[in-house]
Structures are given as structure tokens and as C-alpha cells.
Amino acid sequence: MWGFLLTVAVYIGCKKITQKRWLSKVPVILLAAGILIALILVCHTSYESYNDSACWITWILGPATVAFAWPLSQNLSVLKRNKRAVYGGLLFSCLCTIGLTYLLGRFFHAENPVIFSMLPKSVTTPAAVEISKDLGGIPELTACLVVLTGLLGGLTAHGLFKFLHIRSHAAIGVSIGATSHVLGTSKCAEKHKEKQMVLSTLALIIMALLTALAAPHVVALLEKLCN
């Protein structure tokens, strides 16, 4: 339990710190992670010990993701108007993410456990960890890659869309949800873009389901083609 309480305390503290104007651009999760790593190293505590005492956080991620369904249920009309673009785009995104990640791993001669750990990096953490386990990956590495992917998307996505003059809330929401999962979706919420948040929520849920279903089959097919 000490790991859970420490993590929550550090996160709340970092949230208040980043409200200062000169630190407003620093991602809370990145700052909190850095402080936690420093504390664990200074106290000579093993990662296993910390992880065992902070396991509640991983458990909470599941219900927290499901809670995004509330704004989705209030905006079903948005989904109905964009269903073809949403479902088609997500299927294409899922297959491309799995395929390109696998091929890049092979190109750089990465070992199978590392490649399998990378495949679900665009899926929300609870689902990504389970997918990684099923494929034979390293769950801890997967969790780190999921956070890094979400941070990168959350920090750069809206700026990139603005640069490319993409203003469609549907396109932005689906893209962010499909690639940056909960962290990207939370950025949509912070910017008070409800339509983006709704479609981003839908995208991250469907992306998790598609990746879980497609990853084993895509990997098996690519292994046959590459060997």
C-alpha cells in the first residue's frame, strides 16, 4: 500500500507544481515518474517491491478507462454521423501499427520478446499489458512504451493537426484515441473539446479490442512471410 500512497502523493504534488506558469508545459506524468524513480533509487528499494505495493494503480486504470463511456453515451449522435470513418480508420490504424512495428523490429534485429512488447504500445495500459503477455512480450517494457507513446501523442498531436490545418474534430479525436490512448484523450478533455474526447474515447476502446483480436494473427502471418 505504501507504493500506492506514495504515487498518489507525488502525482498530486506534481499536479500543483505544474500549475505554475514556468512549469505549465511539463507533463505531470513525466515529472511524477522522474521523482518516483529518484525516490526508489535513493531509498534502495527494488522495483518489484514498489510494484507489488502500488498494484492498485494498475487495477484502477481499468475502471478509469470504462468511466470514459459516460461522455460517449451522451454523444452517440456524433458516432452515428461518423461511423464509417471511425471504424474504417481504426481497422487500418490497427493493422498498420502492428505490421509496421513488427517489420521495424525485424529490420533492426530485435529479439522476439522485445518486438512483441512493442506491438500494443498504442493501446491503453491494462489491455496492452495483457496483449503483451499473450504474445510472449515483456509487460514492464510494454507499460513503459505505452506511457511514452501516450506522452508523445498528447504533447504533439494538437500542434501537428494545427500545422497541417486539420480542423475536423472527428478526425482529430479518432487519430488521438487510436495512437495516444488515455493520455491523448485527457488532452482533448483539458482543451474542452468534447466531440474530440468522445470519439477519442471510442477509438481507444475499439483499438484495444481490435489489437487483442488481430495481433496474434498478424504476427503469425508476418512470421511466415519473413522466415
Predicted regions and their residues:
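Small-residue-rich segments of transmembrane alpha-helices in multi-pass membrane proteins
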Residues: L30-V42, G62-A67, G88-T101, L119-V129, ...
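Membrane interface segments of multi-pass transport proteins and intramembrane proteases
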Residues: Q19-V26, K162-H165, K224
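Entry/N-cap segments of selected transmembrane alpha helices
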Residues: F4-L6, L76-T101, A143-L152, T201-L209
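Short helix-capping/hinge motifs at transmembrane helix termini and TM-loop junctions
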Residues: C43-H44, H109-A110, G136, H165, ...
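Juxtamembrane boundary at the C-terminal end of a transmembrane helix
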Residues: R106, A214-N227
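Transmembrane alpha-helices that form the ion-translocation and gating core
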Residues: G88-A128, T149-L164
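Helical membrane-embedded segments and adjacent short helical loop/helix-boundary regions
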Residues: M1-T7, Y11-S73, V78-G89, S93
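Alpha-helical membrane segments and immediately flanking helix-loop junctions
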Residues: L72, N112-L141, L145-L148, R167-L202
